[in-house]
Structure formats: structure tokens, C-alpha cells
Curated annotation (Swiss-Prot):
Species this chain originates from: Nicotiana glauca
Gene Ontology process terms (BP): alkaloid metabolic process; NAD biosynthetic process; nicotine biosynthetic process; quinolinate catabolic process
Binding site for substrate: R141, T172, R173, K174, R196, K206, E239, D266, S298, G299, N300, S319, G320, A321
Protein name: Quinolinate phosphoribosyltransferase [decarboxylating] 1
Stated role: Involved in the biosynthesis of pyridine alkaloid natural products, leading mainly to the production of anabasine, anatabine, nicotine and nornicotine, effective deterrents against herbivores with antiparasitic and pesticide properties (neurotoxins); nornicotine serves as the precursor in the synthesis of the carcinogen compound N'-nitrosonornicotine (NNN). Involved in the catabolism of quinolinic acid (QA).
Amino acid sequence: MFKVFPFTAIGHPHAITAPRLVVKMSAIATKNAVESLVVKPPAHPTYDLKGVIQLALSEDAGDLGDVTCKATIPVVMESEAHFLAKEDGIVAGIALAEMIFAEVDPSLKMEWSISDGDKVHKGLKFGKVQGKAHSIVIAERVVLNFMQRMSGIATLTKAMADAAHPATILETRKTAPGLRLVDKWAVLIGGGKNHRMGLFDMVMIKDNHISAAGGVSKALNSVDQYLEQNKLQMGVEVETRTIAEVLEVLDYASRTKTSLTRIMLDNMVVPLSDGDIEVSMLNEAVDLINGRFETEASGNVTLETVHKIGQTGVTYISSGALTHSVKALDISLKIDTELALEVGRRTKRA
């Protein structure tokens, strides 16, 4: 049975009739809608979902709007369209779809039989949108682009999060340019956790930083001094690639007051020729750290290997594959043909 999920509509009177689609969105309405969500999108200091939706709609509309709709679909035609899952998976992007539909035409009404994060099976009709057919078709591709990508990310995240237990699965910064908020939101919907949003919200000392600084200890010392001088408090993670580097980090931390919070254990998972993995180095590193810092395994993480990695005792497992090469979930949105024809006959356009 379908149930209606309330959503604050965002007006855009020219989305259908104006020759040029200039997207505007109320920041207050967007904030209120986001705050009501069960799984809220992550925050960013310089842009938000408003900006993401603006760009997606405006790049589709160009300077003339939907010329095909103008030629073939009467503006007054009313219809409804159904969301259909064409394969099994976890659906994500329902809340974002509502924001997009409301931006194109606030009179559109949406009903859903599921929520973000729920599982769907092939052939399930899980939602519908009712209103002007013109508006539905204008929003269709943008809505599906987001929903299919987000659902693909959420589906893989759910599978990896379940397999990784008791470790927590994280994504990385390997997201689609301009879509990091959306990609990371999908990870949350799928049951994962977010790594740092960008370069600004966590110190992450990687191999290039270590090489430029002259070693692990020097890099850590520089970070500690920088944070203290600038009165900054944030998480600090350092990448290690060998047991020797792990020991160097632990030695530094034993001698120095440090802001270090997490140690990355990079590529300590060794793939074997038979498809299995060797995790003895990872086990040794986790034992040496012994809970003094959070640990994060990275490298050679797949759906097939993540369970064994999770059993080593690491706190986190990060995987770029969650977002950088995810397979979109096949979802369609089809207008009710009979209803459209009936209205079309009345308007002499069918």
C-alpha cells in the first residue's frame, strides 16, 4: 500500500512555460526539507543540495527548455508515472527526487511504498508522481540519473557494510566531481559511514606528504605544530605502508603529545593467485596498535575480500569502489499511457 511522505514544495512558476529555465530554490525550504529526513545528507561549507539540483536542471534545460515536450505534450495534460525497479537492490534518492520534482513543478504529488534505504525486487512499482505530464517528463531524466546512481552506491555499500562487520565501511574522496554530497549521502543510506568530506575537515597525511616532509615522524610533527599554532581541532590520520612505519608512528606518539587519531594501514592486504587474500601483515599491525588509535584498512578491498579484512580487528575499511566505478541500479519512470491518452483525446492532442 502506498503512503504519502510529506515534502515542502519549492515554487518555480516558469519551469514549464518559460523559454529559458532559470532554476531558483528557497534556501529555507530546502533546509526544512533536509532536516526532516531520516538519513540526512552530509554538510559542506561552500555548497549544498540546492546547488547540485540547480546545475543538474539547468544543464538539461539549456536556453530553450524541453523543446520536445513543448512540441508533443499539452501543458494542461494531467497524468501519473510509476517508478519501476528493473533489478534487485537498495533504493536511494527518493528524498532528492522529491526536491527535484518540487523544483520543476510544486503542484506535482508523489507517493511511495518504500523509503530511502529499503530493498526492492525486480518488477516492483515502488512510487508514483501525479500531475502535469509536461512537468513529469521535464524532471524525469534528472531524477533518474540521481536515483539510479545513488541506488547503485547504496546497494554496493549495504553488501559491503554487512560483509565488513564488525568493521565499519567508509567511502573515499573518489566521487563524481560536483556530486560528492550526493555520493556520500548514498553511502549513508546504504549503511556505511562517511570519510572526510574534503581537504578541509580532517588532516590526512598520505605518502606524498610523508615524502615531501622527509618521513613519517617529521610529517606528524609538522601537523601537530600547525594545528597548535592555528588553534585547530580536527581528526588526524597518517598513512602507513609497512610494519616499520607503524612502529615509527607508535614511537613518535609515545614520545610526543600528538593530535593523531587514526592510522591507515595501506595495502597490507596481499592478493593471492587463487583469489584469496593474505592478511598477516594487517593482523600484525592491528596487534601492535592495540587499540591506542583507530585503524583503517585500505587497498585491495572488494566485496569478496572485505569480510576477511573485517575479521582482523580494524576499526574501519575504506573503499573507493563504492563511488568511483559503481554500477547504477536500473530504475525506470513510465507515464500511465491510458490516462495520458484519455486526457490527450480531450485536448485533441492524442
